[in-house]
Amino acid sequence: LLPVFLLIIGSVRAVESPKREIRAVWLTTIYGLDWPKKPATTEAGRKAQQQELCTILDQLADANFNTVFLQVRLRGDVIYRSAIEPASKTFSGKYGTMPGYDPLAFAIEECHKRGMECHAWFVTFPVGTEKAVKEQGKLSVVKRNPKLCKRHNGEWYLDPGVPETADYILSLVKELVNGYDIDGIQFDYIRYPEQAKTFPDKAVHQKYGKSTRLPDWRRENINKMVYRIYDWVKQAKPWVQVSSSPLGKYNRIERVPNAGWTAYESVFQDPKMWMQKGKQDMIVPMMYYLHDNFFPFVDNWVENCNGRLVVPGLGAYRMDKSEADWTVNDITDQIDYSRYYGGAGCTFFRCANVLDNSKGLYNELKDNYYKYPAQLLPLTWLNDRIPDSPEGICVE
């Protein structure tokens, strides 16, 4: 397979830079990986945090990026004002304490000033390590809603099989969408955890789904929640885009039967069904692989997208020598292929791995691949209603 795909790549390098495409980064706030560098306890510290973000956004704007996926819910803690979950300690140094400003509101305003969209990146089911849950104390969802939570491999998760879990997630979504001028909401970890076979939900399955096979029941738990969230968002603010970042390989396809870790089989995630049902605006699969493990899976996503946007997530972090020591060409080959075969753009994990210009990636994007600005793509399925005739207009 590999020589075939390399031959194809050689033939698509001349693709013109699209006039419309998504050019995005995942901007990570957990542990302050991308932002902020340190918590703020003084006015000077707050201003330093804000300036940090402005510098990041300026660099992205200079390279004609047009979308930021900002991590707003980390592990049962958030970076915005919430009546439901505690503020993250990332910004203030203490759970439940805001840093003296609203990081999400500030980020939205600054993105919009630069003509960029700001999507709320929302970690769905993981709610913290034992240490984090203990540190959050009574503020933790594990303490406040123990019925919803399960401990698995030393971490805590909301259990998708408990019906009230969907109610809880939807309450967070409502608070976020109603309270902020976000352009979209993107669901991460909207799946069962790693080593899902040992996830302790047998009793819940017996109570709520014993007539259905466990794998099918698990997938349907997530499906129903996805549909419910999408329908609510489109009723409340139709222009807010709903997306997810599933595993990069949907299932074991004929072209790559030994695909390994997949969304459908391994973590009971069925994003193709979500698209077929029209319950996603965009799918952003985490495709941190090379060659045979990348190219055919791009095809697979695009072939099954039902007209929705497919935005491959590229592993810029894999260029690090401590990771996989990828080359710049490894990344640009993936951009070329995605453009040629129907992708709606690309996003990079993570922001700092682009802006630090590792192996010249930032310069390559700024000077070549993103040399000219690109508009975002129209969401045509949201505009299929004929507008009402204007009323109350008189011509003198």
Feature locations, PLM:
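Aromatic- and acidic-residue-enriched carbohydrate-binding clefts of CAZyme catalytic domains
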Residues: 21, 28-36, 76-104, 131-160, ...
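Active-site clefts of carbohydrate-active enzymes
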Residues: 29, 241-259, 298-333
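Catalytic domains of carbohydrate-active enzymes, especially glycoside hydrolases
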Residues: 48-77, 179-182
